[in-house]
Amino acid sequence: MGLIDIIVAVLLDFAIGDPYWFPHPVIYIGKLISYLEEVGRKHFKSNKGLKTLGGLVVLTIAITSFGIPFLILWMVKDSFWIFHFLNIILIWTTLAAKSLKVEGKRVYYALKNEDIQEAREKLSYIVGRDTRNLTEEEIIRADIETIMENTADGVIAPLFYAMIGGAPFAMMYKGINTMDSMLGYMNDKYIHLGFFPAKVDDVFNFIPARISGVLICLSAPIVKGNIIRSFKVMLRDRKNHKSPNCAYPEGAGAGVMGIQLGGTNVYFGKAVYKPTIGDRIKDLHHELINDSVKLMYASETLMVIIYALTVTSYNLR
């Protein structure tokens, strides 16, 4: 039934995504992280103390985000339908494909309507960089980078952990990833507090990021890309990012679409140089945002198909 639960959760995300009316667990995880930071900063003042606080936050969030779903499912383990209903709902809340598509395509529609100011504003909701003065090409690049990176973080990774350990594992991953997105910055405020959150997130994304890269490469035909070229670009440029993981999905996407990603961006008023990823075979055009969304969905579908075939073949032994 684990396979059925995952398929239903994926279909739910396809259909309705993250409705605003639903009490999303990530909201409460985020509130807990903010509370731990606020209280912790009152007691941990030194750089070493802040690093220790970061480690304590990691433990608290990992235990809480795993423990609560585990206890909920354990309490209803004798009720078949309630158990699987809750497992499906919890897994569904960890998946972000539909919301990523919606947010990414808001930028696309603004560019299609030649409203660059609107595109900058919509982009600012989903990226950490300063979007106020971005050109159209820079907006497109940022949107594609976000979709490719979050194909790994927001789609493939939670699926991977759900396949290993159901909703508790998927939710624990989501807690760790949320913690990294809130604390894992290398600026003056978070360089010490965010050290362990960032490192732990890197560890948890190590395998999913590489799986994502492979799946994106294999999905190349869906956008008339070349599988072999995609793998070559991904493997060549896999280290062209400060993160040990991000260049895999971004490199795969760049290889599939024949574009160049990376380069200098402005974060919190500071210019941050990043090596380029991919080859500029094509100029960046807003229609490529649609291609990146197609690659995200194709990768997710391929992941589920491979898992289904694996489970089925194992059960037939």
UniProtKB/Swiss-Prot annotation:
InterPro entries: Cobalamin_biosynth_CobD/CbiB. Converts cobyric acid to cobinamide by the addition of aminopropanol on the F carboxylic group. GO terms for biological process: cobalamin biosynthetic process. It is found in: Cell membrane. The chain crosses the membrane at residues 20-40, 56-76, 80-100, 152-172, 203-223, 292-312. Pathway: Cofactor biosynthesis; adenosylcobalamin biosynthesis. This is Cobalamin biosynthesis protein CobD. PANTHER family: COBALAMIN BIOSYNTHESIS PROTEIN CBIB. Keywords: Cell membrane, Cobalamin biosynthesis, Membrane, Transmembrane, Transmembrane helix. It comes from Clostridium tetani (strain Massachusetts / E88). GO terms for molecular function: ABC-type vitamin B12 transporter activity; threonine-phosphate decarboxylase activity. HAMAP family: CobD_CbiB. It is a multi-pass membrane protein. Its main location: membrane. Belongs to the CobD/CbiB family. One of its GO terms (cellular component) is plasma membrane.
